């Protein structure tokens, strides 16, 4: 039924109810009409229906109905972006629900209010709206947990929780609370899947995909969006599916795959949009994408023969990318344009224009240093043009200002710009330059601002006698701009004009690339890289899976994320499909591709709660010890899943989880009787990569693809549900990520099967036909063991391993073992004729079926094509046995038709001389050592034992991580013996697990030398001396050595696993952000570390973020008690990282953040995160924030969040932003007067305090009896009056101060005797340092000095202390 038919039907029913006076019925039809209209984007009409519904229900005094009507009116107003009116109606809904004590409606009211505040945040980015939204959602969730449990069905409760978790996840994502965000989304998706809530599942997956996209995690984003798209299809909601396609196109654009992005946008266009502006957005995005594709194709054609045209196209591409906000691609295009212009020797002025484009684009990318470089190049190319020089110098000054350069570097640029503008007599430009210079001087050099202001006034009074330069003409529209919609292949008739069904549309997604090369039919993929088998496994179509496998579909292909069909079947819980795939040889322990984080099918099943599937995998031999890249075993994955969802699990599921946990524990400890894997009836060729399994048919068509290199991709701005952002206007961020791009095809609507760059290159080969001759009757024998070994090595490389796997193995308990028969013909039996054909592609169409057996005909595809020569002719290389030794020397044949002779007797090769064949390709073995995976080639020319592989893996790990492990290797849980030959136990592309049994840890000095040697870094003598003298000490110090990152790396690697280390001091070096990961790796191996000093190490926000992210979930900083990050340029933006760091160090008692570049903006961006972190730091005793120009407001925010009951020492030296910042003492007094304040030591030196401030401070001393030490030094406006005030206030306390510092204050002598008496009574230590002290003061101290006290009296210093 169409929309118009439904509307007519409901309108008739509404009219009938109106005639009959049935007001409630009429209101119900109004409600239904409003919902239907709103679902199709007609919000204004829907609003009128709900308003009519409200009037009708008010007339019959239906309070609950009125409440619901207010909710619907509020929702419609919110959709029309009238948020104030929407909130008014929603609060009326809340009040009415409260008056009825209806907890269900109260829950919905709070949830609706929260969603509206979330929409307000999306509209105006107000943080206050976010906090209100979070509070509303939490109230709603509390009602569900506390009031509605037991009142509603489990499904209704799950539905409420699903939506609340989703909304809380969105709120936490905007608040940058990543961990909470991920947990909420996981809970929402889990509940939606369990209860088949497809609309909520769609929203959760869609939003999670958008979050992954914004975070640059394209693989995860594509998988989430595909899941959302499946939900939209299941609900037959075309608009929702259209939104998914739009977001998929954005992801693909970021990856540089504009052909695939075009296909996704065309699908979105055909599906339609709920809002008219969304359809306009899709059209604009499609125009942009098509323009890019057109220009890229023109550029590819022009690069070969028309460099001038290519240069123009590069400029058009750069302009197009710039307008779209894709600045990295724009910069790349302009850079290419510049390169071509230099090759063509274009004029200087033309080169200067390109440099301007590059500089502007780099400025948009916030890379102001490089922008300055290009402006300087423009300046060099435009000598003599005063006006252009003025503009360029002005741009240089602005870029340097953005880069944060000092005033001394900015001022000359402004001055040169102003002088050039004067020469060009451009008064308006002069005013602009002086105005900006004036603004800069107010911030950086206030004393010079007055002169600039005077010059500005003089300039504004002067009359401009010349006409100002006209505005630059607007850029003409690109010649290659996309044509109108009708020309852009947007027509509904292009791909589905014949009324194709949904199934045909899905088949269109899986069409192969119709390019120049013939492509394997099984390698057809959709935009996600999914094959037909992937789709069948996702949709649970067992019959389809069976048909595909029987027809020869590969079993283990990967999609673009890296998932195999078995992964998908396990993820969706299709037990019978999993069973079928395992029966036919699917890889049970496949860890997935690069985007899968090492998740095996068992991990996937457990992470989705499919316990029957997990049980089947374990029975079929799945490893229970393999870990993901995050270090999680299957058992830990299950425990994490139970912990996350425990509250939402029913009793049966909890019991199943407990049973599975016991099963995994028994299996991992070796107590479970593990079922042997079923015999693989269709085994994979061991020379295949795991990305594509061999087909089950004997002679499959080979697949091929062309990989593209990775390039820089931008991370886009935020996109929310039901609100897509045009590709022409979204801002970008610069990131480097692997991209996937489609290869060219004749029909661009067909997805390409050869897109993802992570796939490995494959070549198609055909195995040569082998003819086995009849045994000869007689022959001379001259056999040697060396000859047979050479043959065996050669034939092993040809593909005999595949045949061995196909032959059934003997039972282990068999007593009668038949004599082994060699697959080779002994030299004494073979014929001298040419019995082995050349292994080149054959031209004949077929072979007799009786020539060889089936398994001998099965192809073996090596990775690299190897041309094999005939064994009985000298077409390639032959070997000669030198007299006196048995070595083989290979030489090229001089005449391929004449047999070569060797040896002194010149015997013909037919008499028994061996041949040296071309070396077979090496076996590749993947070795997993903890979180590192190494691919190690094993040459087959010499049979290597497993011990050799172990040594190679250990050396590679040492080269990468700096630690030399002692390893044992396991394959599928079986221990590999060191003496076994590698080809006998492993096949190419097998993955083995290396278990670290111990570490090779020589003395610290030797470890440092070994690390320097492996890194090619020279030894630093002072570090070597420190290593020698501190090797057995629990403390290691390498301070003030100015070690650069290259010199610090071997030092940090040498300290790995130095478990005795408790204190590490690296102050005064150049660690920087780049070395943070190396430091983290070392900290992760020193669990007993309690002190870490990283002060003055050039550590910035990025380095701190890396330390925090790497230490999350690990024990790297768990025992740390003292951390010094002073004198590092952390800046105001480090708030989130600092909060995470505090949470990662639960035992931290001392934190020093002196001179870290904090300003008045500190705490503004991440106040909630930092506040919560400080409040949770229950062990924090000492905090230093000195020498950060916080100012009074920022200091107040800081002190509000500090734990008053536990903090003992607080250093706030020199935190006043300026001399006029007189309110610095007020937040300190508020903190001291807090209930339970435990502060004992307070430092307020160098804060421009005066007598008034000290007077206010002294009044609060009786309220803070814990304070025993006060440092007010370096405050020159503090006089004797302040000292008297302090002493008087101390008399009101039960005890005085143990320390009072007044050095650098204006204490003038002589002090009267009463004052000295108070000093000796109330103070145990006093420091005075002022030139105004007199000799009488010194005499008074000597006369009144109590026993056990000492003094220091020298020049202007007067210190005393009671011992």
From Swiss-Prot:
Residues 465-510 have a biased composition (Acidic residues). GO terms for biological process: double-strand break repair via homologous recombination; replication fork processing. TPR repeats lie at residues 27-60, 67-100, 107-147, 162-195, 202-235, 242-275, 311-344, 352-385. Keywords: ANK repeat, Chromatin regulator, Chromosome, Cytoplasm, DNA damage, DNA repair, Leucine-rich repeat, Methylation, Nucleus, Repeat, TPR repeat. The modification Omega-N-methylarginine is found at residue 796. It is found in: Nucleus; Chromosome; Cytoplasm. GO terms for cellular component: cytoplasm; nuclear replication fork; site of double-strand break. Signal peptide: none annotated. Residues 692-713 have a biased composition (Pro residues). LRR repeats lie at residues 1060-1081, 1088-1108, 1119-1140, 1147-1168, 1179-1199, 1206-1214, 1238-1261, 1266-1287, 1296-1317, 1322-1343. Residues 460-511, 662-786, 841-866, 883-909 are annotated as: Disordered. GO terms for molecular function: histone binding; histone reader activity. Residues 666-684, 842-853 have a biased composition (Polar residues). Component of the MMS22L-TONSL complex, a complex at least composed of MMS22L and TONSL/NFKBIL2. Interacts with the MCM complex, the FACT complex and the RPA complex. Interacts with MCM5; the interaction is direct. Binds histones, with a strong preference for histone H3.1 (histones H3.1 and H3-4/H3.1t). Interacts (via ANK repeats) with histone H4; specifically binds histone H4 lacking methylation at 'Lys-20' (H4K20me0). May interact with DNAJC9; the interaction seems to be histone-dependent. The ANK repeats mediate the interaction with the MCM complex and histones, while the LRR repeats mediate the interaction with MMS22L. Component of the MMS22L-TONSL complex, a complex that promotes homologous recombination-mediated repair of double-strand breaks (DSBs) at stalled or collapsed replication forks. The MMS22L-TONSL complex is required to maintain genome integrity during DNA replication. It mediates the assembly of RAD51 filaments on single-stranded DNA (ssDNA): the MMS22L-TONSL complex is recruited to DSBs following histone replacement by histone chaperones and eviction of the replication protein A complex (RPA/RP-A) from DSBs. This is Tonsoku-like protein. It comes from Mus musculus.
């Amino acid at each position: 039924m169409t929309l118009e038919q439904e509307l007519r039907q409901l309108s008739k029913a509404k009219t009938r109810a109106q005639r009959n006076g049935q007001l409630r019925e009429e209101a119900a039809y109004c409600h239904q009409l409003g919902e239907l209209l709103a679902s199709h984007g007609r919000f204004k009409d829907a609003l009128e229906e709900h308003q009519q519904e409200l009037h009708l229900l008010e007339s019959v005094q239906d309070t609950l109905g009125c409440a619901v009507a207010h909710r619907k009116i509020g929702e419609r107003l919110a959709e029309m972006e009238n948020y104030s009116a929407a909130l008014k109606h929603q609060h009326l809904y809340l009040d009415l629900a409260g008056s009825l004590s209806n907890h269900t409606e109260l829950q919905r009211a709070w949830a609706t209010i929260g969603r509206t505040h979330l929409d307000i945040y999306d509209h105006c980015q107000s943080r206050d709206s976010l906090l209100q939204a979070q509070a509303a959602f939490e109230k709603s969730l509390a009602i569900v947990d506390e009031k509605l449990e037991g009142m509603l069905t489990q499904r209704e409760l799950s539905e409420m929780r699903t939506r609340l978790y989703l909304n809380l996840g969105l709120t936490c994502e905007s608040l940058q609370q990543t961990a909470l965000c991920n947990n909420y989304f996981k809970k929402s998706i889990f509940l939606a899947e369990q209860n088949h809530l497809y609309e909520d599942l769609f929203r959760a997956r869609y939003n999670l995909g958008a979050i992954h996209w914004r975070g640059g995690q394209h693989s995860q984003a594509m998988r989430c969006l595909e899941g959302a798209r499946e939900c939209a299809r299941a609900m037959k909601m075309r608009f929702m599916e259209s939104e998914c396609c739009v977001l998929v196109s954005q992801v693909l654009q970021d990856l540089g795959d504009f052909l695939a992005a075009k296909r996704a946008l065309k699908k979105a266009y055909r599906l339609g949009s709920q809002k008219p502006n969304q359809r306009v957005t899709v059209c604009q995005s499609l125009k942009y994408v098509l323009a890019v594709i057109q220009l890229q194709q023109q550029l590819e054609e022009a690069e070969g023969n028309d460099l001038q045209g290519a240069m123009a196209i590069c400029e058009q591409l750069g302009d197009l990318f710039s307008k779209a906000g894709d600045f990295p691609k724009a910069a790349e295009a302009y850079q290419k344009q510049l390169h071509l212009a230099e090759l063509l020797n274009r004029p200087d002025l033309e080169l200067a224009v390109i440099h301007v484009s590059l500089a502007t684009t780099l400025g948009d990318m916030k890379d102001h240093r490089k922008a300055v470089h290009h402006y300087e190049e423009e300046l060099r190319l435009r000598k003599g043009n005063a006006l252009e020089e003025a503009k360029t110098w002005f741009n240089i000054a602005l870029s340097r200002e953005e880069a944060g350069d000092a005033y001394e570097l900015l001022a000359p640029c402004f001055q040169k710009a102003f002088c050039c503008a004067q020469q060009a007599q451009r008064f308006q430009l002069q005013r602009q330059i002086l105005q900006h210079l004036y603004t800069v001087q107010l911030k950086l050099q206030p004393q010079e601002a007055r002169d600039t202001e005077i010059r500005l006034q003089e300039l504004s009074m002067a009359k401009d006698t010349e006409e100002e330069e006209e505005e630059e003409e607007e850029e003409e529209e690109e010649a290659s701009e996309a044509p109108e919609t009708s020309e852009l292949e947007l027509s509904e008739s292009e791909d589905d004009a014949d009324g194709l069904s949904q199934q045909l549309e899905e088949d269109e997604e899986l069409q192969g690339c119709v390019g120049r090369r013939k492509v394997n039919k099984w390698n057809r993929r959709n935009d996600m890289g999914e094959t037909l088998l992937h789709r069948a496994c996702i949709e649970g179509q067992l019959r389809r899976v069976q048909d595909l496998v029987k027809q020869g579909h590969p079993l283990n292909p990967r999609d673009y994320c890296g998932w195999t069909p078995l992964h998908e079947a396990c993820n969706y819980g299709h037990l019978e499909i999993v069973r079928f795939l395992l029966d036919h040889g699917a890889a049970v322990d496949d860890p997935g591709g690069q985007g899968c984080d090492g998740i095996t099918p068992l991990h996937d099943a457990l992470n989705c709660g499919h316990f029957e599937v997990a049980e089947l995998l374990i029975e079929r031999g799945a490893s229970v010890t393999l870990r993901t890249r995050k270090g999680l075993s299957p058992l830990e994955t299950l425990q994490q899943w139970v912990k996350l969802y425990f509250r939402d699990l029913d009793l049966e599921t909890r019991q199943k989880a407990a049973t599975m946990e016991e099963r995994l524990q028994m299996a991992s400890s070796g107590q479970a009787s593990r079922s042997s894997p079923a015999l693989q009836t269709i085994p994979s060729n061991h020379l295949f990569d795991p990305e594509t399994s061999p087909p089950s048919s004997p002679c499959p068509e080979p697949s091929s693809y062309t990989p593209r290199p990775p390039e820089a991709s931008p991370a886009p701005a935020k996109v929310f549900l039901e609100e897509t952002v045009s590709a022409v206007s979204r801002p970008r961020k610069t990131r480097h990520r692997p991209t996937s791009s489609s290869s060219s095809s004749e029909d661009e609507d067909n997805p390409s099967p050869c897109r993802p760059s992570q796939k490995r290159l494959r070549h198609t080969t055909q195995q040569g036909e082998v003819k086995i001759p009849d045994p000869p009757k007689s022959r001379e024998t001259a056999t040697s063991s060396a000859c047979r070994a050479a043959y065996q090595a050669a034939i092993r490389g040809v593909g005999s391993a595949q045949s061995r796997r196909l032959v059934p193995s003997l039972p282990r308990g068999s007593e009668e073992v038949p004599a082994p028969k060699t697959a080779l013909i002994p030299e004494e039996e073979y014929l001298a004729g040419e019995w082995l054909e050349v292994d080149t592609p054959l031209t004949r169409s077929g072979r007799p079926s009786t020539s060889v057996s089936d398994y001998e005909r099965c192809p073996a595809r090596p990775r690299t094509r190897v041309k094999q020569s005939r064994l009985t002719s000298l077409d390639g290389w032959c070997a000669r046995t030198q007299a006196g030794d048995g070595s083989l020397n290979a030489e090229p044949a001089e005449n391929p038709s004449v047999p070569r002779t060797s040896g002194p007797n010149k015997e013909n090769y037919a008499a028994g001389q061996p041949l040296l064949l071309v070396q077979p390709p090496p076996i590749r073995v993947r070795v997993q050592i903890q979180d590192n995976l190494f691919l190690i080639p094993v040459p087959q020319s010499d049979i290597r034992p497993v011990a050799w592989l172990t040594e190679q893996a250990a050396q590679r790990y040492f080269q990468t991580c700096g630690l030399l492990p002692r390893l044992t290797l396991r394959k599928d849980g079986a221990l590999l013996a060191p003496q076994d030959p590698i080809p006998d136990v492993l096949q190419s592309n097998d993955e083995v697990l290396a278990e670290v049994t111990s570490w090779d840890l020589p003395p610290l000095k030797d470890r440092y030398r070994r690390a320097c040697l492996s890194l090619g870094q020279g030894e630093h003598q002072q570090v070597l001396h420190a290593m020698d003298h501190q090797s057995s000490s629990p403390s290691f110090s390498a301070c003030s050595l100015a070690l650069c990152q290259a010199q610090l790396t071997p030092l940090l690697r040498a300290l790995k696993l130095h478990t005795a280390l408790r204190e590490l001091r690296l102050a005064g070096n150049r660690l920087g952000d780049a070395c943070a990961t190396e430091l983290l790796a070392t900290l992760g191996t020193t669990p007993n570390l309690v002190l870490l000093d990283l002060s003055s190490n050039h550590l910035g926000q990025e380095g701190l973020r890396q330390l925090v992210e790497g230490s999350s979930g690990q024990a790297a900083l768990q025992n740390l008690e003292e951390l010094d990050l002073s004198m590092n340029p952390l800046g105001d933006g480090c708030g989130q990282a600092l909060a995470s760091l505090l949470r990662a160090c639960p035992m931290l008692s001392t934190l020093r953040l002196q001179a870290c570049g904090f300003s008045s903006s500190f705490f503004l961006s991440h106040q909630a995160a930092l506040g919560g972190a400080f409040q949770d730091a229950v062990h924090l005793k000492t905090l230093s924030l000195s020498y950060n120009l916080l100012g009074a407001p920022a200091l107040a925010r800081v002190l509000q969040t500090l734990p008053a009951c536990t903090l003992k020492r607080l250093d706030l030296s020199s935190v006043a932003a300026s001399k006029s910042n007189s309110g610095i003492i007020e937040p300190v007094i508020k903190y001291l007067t807090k209930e339970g304040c435990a502060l004992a030591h307070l430092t307020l030196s160098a804060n421009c305090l005066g007598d008034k401030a000290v007077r206010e401070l002294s009044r609060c001393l009786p309220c803070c009896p814990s304070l025993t030490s006060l440092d007010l030094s370096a405050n020159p406006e503090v006089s004797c009056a302040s000292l008297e005030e302090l002493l008087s206030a101390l008399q009101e306390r039960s005890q005085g101060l143990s320390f009072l510092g007044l050095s650098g204050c204006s204490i003038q002598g002589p002090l009267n005797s009463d004052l000295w008496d108070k000093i000796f009574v109330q103070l145990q230590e006093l420091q005075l340092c002022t030139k105004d002290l007199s000799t009488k003061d010194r005499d008074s101290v000597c006369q009144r000095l109590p026993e056990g006290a000492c003094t220091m009296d020298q020049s202007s210093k007067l210190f005393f202390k009671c011992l």
